[in-house]
Amino acid sequence: MNVVILGCGRTGARLALELSSKGHGVTLIERNPDSLRRLGKTDGFNIVIGNGLDIDVIERAKVAEADAFFAVTRGDNTNIMAAQIVQRMNKTAKVCVKVADPERAKAYRDMGMFCINASSLLAGLCRDWLLNEPYETIDKYNVLSKELEI
């Protein structure tokens, strides 16, 4: 499988290493070349340095040929905008977006994007671990986010 990952922070680097170790082709889009140090050596990865919202950068990453695209930068807006661009360029790719704001995650899920909200996922796993309950599917954890009213 050919995968494009936008962002080489902790999540992007870990995902790249995991997928590469399973024999998948991985292309990383990253603005800051220093972030690539998280990979150790970059052999075996296709690296595109640039802004992941720039069409030229996205085209150089060959998203039109990718089987999957992950937008995992620290910025919700960047992740969502990049995912929308990729969805238009490649109708068949699986697109996953890391979103910190649970309200945004729900809105973009309703648009057909697979969104991961890390705080909801972690909270659900911790709850089930503590209560000795069986673990749920990722979709169950992703929608946990009920905000507290103060």
Which role fits each region the language model picked out?
Residues 1-150:
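Cytosolic regulatory regions of ion transport systems
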